[in-house]
Amino acid sequence: MGFLKLIEIENFKSYKGRQIIGPFQRFTAIIGPNGSGKSNLMDAISFVLGEKTSNLRVKTLRDLIHGAPVGKPAANRAFVSMVYSEEGAEDRTFARVIVGGSSEYKINNKVVQLHEYSEELEKLGILIKARNFLVFQGAVESIAMKNPKERTALFEEISRSGELAQEYDKRKKEMVKAEEDTQFNYHRKKNIAAERKEAKQEKEEADRYQRLKDEVVRAQVQLQLFKLYHNEVEIEKLNKELASKNKEIEKDKKRMDKVEDELKEKKKELGKMMREQQQIEKEIKEKDSELNQKRPQYIKAKENTSHKIKKLEAAKKSLQNAQKHYKKRKGDMDELEKEMLSVEKARQEFEERMEEESQSQGRDLTLEENQVKKYHRLKEEASKRAATLAQELEKFNRDQKADQDRLDLEERKKVETEAKIKQKLREIEENQKRIEKLEEYITTSKQSLEEQKKLEGELTEEVEMAKRRIDEINKELNQVMEQLGDARIDRQESSRQQRKAEIMESIKRLYPGSVYGRLIDLCQPTQKKYQIAVTKVLGKNMDAIIVDSEKTGRDCIQYIKEQRGEPETFLPLDYLEVKPTDEKLRELKGAKLVIDVIRYEPPHIKKALQYACGNALVCDNVEDARRIAFGGHQRHKTVALDGTLFQKSGVISGGASDLKAKARRWDEKAVDKLKEKKERLTEELKEQMKAKRKEAELRQVQSQAHGLQMRLKYSQSDLEQTKTRHLALNLQEKSKLESELANFGPRINDIKRIIQSREREMKDLKEKMNQVEDEVFEEFCREIGVRNIREFEEEKVKRQNEIAKKRLEFENQKTRLGIQLDFEKNQLKEDQDKVHMWEQTVKKDENEIEKLKKEEQRHMKIIDETMAQLQDLKNQHLAKKSEVNDKNHEMEEIRKKLGGANKEMTHLQKEVTAIETKLEQKRSDRHNLLQACKMQDIKLPLSKGTMDDISQEEGSSQGEESVSGSQRTSSIYAREALIEIDYGDLCEDLKDAQAEEEIKQEMNTLQQKLNEQQSVLQRIAAPNMKAMEKLESVRDKFQETSDEFEAARKRAKKAKQAFEQIKKERFDRFNACFESVATNIDEIYKALSRNSSAQAFLGPENPEEPYLDGINYNCVAPGKRFRPMDNLSGGEKTVAALALLFAIHSYKPAPFFVLDEIDAALDNTNIGKVANYIKEQSTCNFQAIVISLKEEFYTKAESLIGVYPEQGDCVISKVLTFDLTKYPDANPNPNEQ
């Protein structure tokens, strides 16, 4: 889809110099203060697209140059160019330049003519004349205020049908004038033809006078010969026909006997089939009951399987978690055992090393005995000297040991607390996993419960509805049976009525939708008291068949003739001419229009009912009917409730007893409907009983739902207990332990500080004691070769202390690891027990599922087998039902054949009697003709016999029944039969006449001709001798007039063809636009209103030629009732007008749409809706360029073009562009408005 990319303006209106505006996005808003030149930008777009100067708010093209309106033009030329971009094609430039006082058009910088320019724009969908690309300021309000005629003018402009209006009017005038000329010449020709005829008659009178004299005698002979000839032909024909009919009667008797035997055989076969059908129905009922019992068992088995599968999945998940924990704990224990072995190995290596070192170092500092004694003496002396210091140091040592014990205790407690915290964390993790499992199970259970509840609700509703409906059906059936009992439904239809009903059904099938039915079947008096009156008024039209068109009626008549049906009356709706109902008659007191007391369906048969009823009135009694019929200044057709009819002509008719019999047909029609209703209710009762049998399935579902609800309740209780008790308690204990652990650090640090401080004091005391020892052992140390006595003592003591300390570290590590190993072993055993337990559970569940699946499959197999058997029975039932129907049809056909044969037999017997009567009549006619010829002395040409053989006695009439009279007549007829007449003088054409109507017509013609000849002969006077000259003159004049008439007729035909052509073109243009707009406007109005309940309608006042009259436009605002356009609020009118604007734009849409302040009359809500609609449409249907002053509107755009003024001799417009796509909309969803 193409779009407007850039606009380049130079010295156009308020835009001084050259300015490039753009790029334009799919939805661009032009904003700026009043008077800044926004509308001038729209004028620039209109200008470059070829808009007329008058629509650009200036008088001349020069006034469009910047500064020209104030007398200071910025230049002698100005131009506007547009860059149009299309995907997959090069950009095209369209430019319009003002040079002097005219425009110059360019495409891609090449100068072209205006028509070429327009054609290129039209290829893009831009129609200059229709202005389908822009909406000027105030146009929305203008459209909202338009009346229907003005709306038509708008459509004329958009569709360009208005371009043809002048030519349309011109050709219409030419057509009317040509038709008037033709009519004038026709009347002139007619008058001259009458003159010619008169002159011709005068001439012929003279010729005819003599000719008639000769022809009168010949005509008399011809007439009598004609009568006698055809009398003899008819007698011969009747004799042959009589013999043929007697043969047909014999054949018919034999055929009837054969058909009756066949009918008896078919009845036996039908009885057998119906018994078989009833047996199948019984088996179907039993299988259906069996299926209803088996289905809940299958549902229960399936539910058990599903529940057990869910439990298995949960158990498998728990097994995986337990195995995971077991594997992790096993790994931790393996690590601890490895660490224990490593510590033990390190301890052994240390002991071995110490043993080796003690052996190598033990011999270095060995003292002699005297040196040992001296060492002990000096040691005792040093102790005495430092006794005070030793006591003080001993006290420090005791305190230090006590604090060291405290420190060890705190550190041990810290380690234990850390172990307890780890244990609590594991317990918390276990609690959380249990909660997750419970929540998952509860969610699954809730879903299952919802499904069960939903199924329970559906089944409950279905069963309850079935129960209610069964009660209703039983009540209705009781009522129907009572009504049928009252109506004595055992009435038997005559074969004639059956035949008519069959033909009616046949033509309905042949012409579905075109044949509606008989009038009596399509209407019903509103009350029973009106039945006789309505029957009287409808009369013979009661049985008339209503069809949609004359063609359908003729086709039906042809079909009925082919089927040899009785004559029928047809009322074609397109052919009937009906006078409108006189509304004043509804105001008469004591009377109602007959059409008002009749219900009818479907509605479009009203025309036929109006035709049958007219403006007839129905009154309660005869006096009121007579008063209203004849009492006023104007007569009316009225009927009383007893059937007395008063016609306008003054004729009064009654016939109450016959009318009552006819009126009973309304009740018979009701009985037929009651029978149909009874059959329909019986079938529905069977279906509802099937639905009621689902109660067992409902109870099963309710039981399953209750069990699921109880399990859900226990799970929720367990979840709540786990959350509130176990998890909360563990979290509380963990928090308490963490708090205790946090307190260990400060206490340990305090003890360590005390120990360190005491160590410093002890160090000072030791140094003092060392000084005393150094003084006492000074000489001894030199003797044994050490710096001081402590070096000697520490070699042994220090080593022993280090070894003891190292051994203690090893013991502590082993103790710690042993405790952890014992704990991990206990936990590992618990995890192993859990794994074993879950493995057993999974195995057990899998075995149970296998059993349940087999049980489910067993039930399913039983159901499938039962359903297959049921379907087989149903198929057998359908087949048997089809056979019964076929057999019934065969019997019906045989009955029809029997009825037809019977009817044909009766018909043949009637025909034989009629032929014998006709034969007797023809013989009597021949006797009378011969007798008349003899009496009138008309000489007949005879080939055998003479005129004397004709008897003078009159033939006996049909009323004579005596034997002697009949014998005498037969004797006369036999004697006259011997007379043979020579028909050689009779014209062959007269002999060839076959049909009775044709013979009668020829006879009348001959008689009339004879009468005329005799009459003319008596009246004719001396002929006019100048008649020939007058005839020649009139003939020349007639030829001249005929030529003029023919020329005028051809001119009229040509003018009408020209008019019809322009009329069709104008209608096609207008209708194409109107249909497109009318189709799209409702959808657009809904989209603008953001409400699917909104409705918009367009309708022409004149559908044949819509451009000659107005177009109605109505809208139903969301949440409101239908109101005329004038009663809508201002905002609603504006939205409606916008809907019409966008719908018009959808007809041959331009790629972009320029709109000037269409939101002026909208409130914030409607502004949002319109803006969102434009935003939606701009993404796919068209580019929107909108001038707006309202923030609620232009914030929805993809880009803004800001226009601001600079003051000078006149306003100078400047332009800024702003891309809004970089700033996402705070409300991106337009549907939220």
Swiss-Prot record:
Compositional bias of kind Low complexity: 953-967
The UniProt record lists the keyword Electron transport: no
Tissue: Ubiquitous (at protein level).
Pfam families from the UniProt entry: SMC_hinge, SMC_N
Any one Gene Ontology cellular component term annotated for this protein: nucleus
Subcellular location: Nucleus; Chromosome; Chromosome, Centromere
Biased amino acid composition, Basic and acidic residues: 284-293
Region (Disordered): 284-308, 348-369, 947-969
Single Gene Ontology MF annotation: mediator complex binding
Maturation and modification: Phosphorylated upon ionizing radiation or DNA methylation. Phosphorylation of Ser-957 and Ser-966 activates it and is required for S-phase checkpoint activation. Ubiquitinated by the DCX(DCAF15) complex, leading to its degradation.
Chief place of localization: nucleus
Binding residue positions for ATP: 32-39
Record's comment describing the protein's domains: The flexible SMC hinge domain, which separates the large intramolecular coiled coil regions, allows the heterotypic interaction with the corresponding domain of SMC3, forming a V-shaped heterodimer. The two heads of the heterodimer are then connected by different ends of the cleavable RAD21 protein, forming a ring structure.
Protein name stated in the entry: Structural maintenance of chromosomes protein 1A
Higher taxonomy: Eukaryota, Metazoa, Chordata, Craniata, Vertebrata
